[in-house]
């Protein structure tokens, strides 16, 4: 800017002199050498101190950094005075006042309680618990002594299973045996609960070519059907009656008496039968399988060993 003013002043002075000295009609050319001096001033501004981002608000410095003014003359500029360093202390590593975020809150749920200690062993070992889908596979109790008559065998293979379902033992009834015999000896396979006035429940079954009432009661009517009743305990009106109806009548708590009879039929007729067979009928009083009463009369197994034949 100083150079521009000087050059302009010289040009104006030259013009005025020409007007005063030059005679009329005389052209005077005056050459002026104009020297333009350009001065470059380099100002070194210190880099600001980098302060790490923290959670505190830094205090203002006691003195702002001094920035030298731009010189107004063409003379050699004076060196800028030294810039006083900022009074903001640089935090030492590891000593920053930065407050870390609070730790996440603990979970609201309480820790799981410790497992209870195992119960002390009792004087008599408890029977093994049955798996959920089938009766226990522990050792079977001893079978009835040989030489037992038909009534004792049929009664045993009812009561051994009833005890596993909290049901009392059945008492043999000659009247129920008599009505069962009449149906069995008819050799006509099918239910009939009207004989001798009725009022009883009934299970029927047959075996082709052999006679084993123990296997019929324990294997076919109890073991095979008890598995199919899993999941129905506590249900007053379970479905799929034809899959487990023999089993539930055998262990029905409200039933107190039973009478059975097995007849040999050379040509068994009726539902799904035929040929030589042994036809077994068991009648029960009071009758079981009453709708709306299953939950109180058919209890889950207690885990006693499985009986097999």
Swiss-Prot record:
SUPFAM superfamilies: PR-1-like. Residues 61-92, 99-147 have a biased composition (Pro residues). Belongs to the CRISP family. One of its GO terms (molecular function) is lipid binding. It is found in: Secreted. Residues 47-59 have a biased composition (Low complexity). The keyword Secreted applies. The keyword Chloroplast does not apply. Pfam families: CAP. InterPro entries: Allrgn_V5/Tpx1_CS, CAP_dom, CAP_sf, CRISP-related. CDD domains: CAP_euk. The lineage of its organism: Eukaryota, Fungi, Dikarya, Ascomycota, Pezizomycotina. This is Probable pathogenesis-related protein ARB_02861. It comes from Arthroderma benhamiae (strain ATCC MYA-4681 / CBS 112371). Residues 1-17 form the signal peptide. Secreted protein required for efficient export of lipids such as acetylated sterols. Acts in detoxification of hydrophobic compounds. Its main location: secreted. Glycans are attached at residue 164. Residues 47-152 are annotated as: Disordered. GO terms for cellular component: extracellular region. GO terms for biological process: lipid transport. The SCP domain is necessary and sufficient for lipid export and sterol-binding. Residues 154-284 form the SCP domain. Keywords: Allergen, Glycoprotein, Lipid transport, Lipid-binding, Secreted, Signal, Transport.
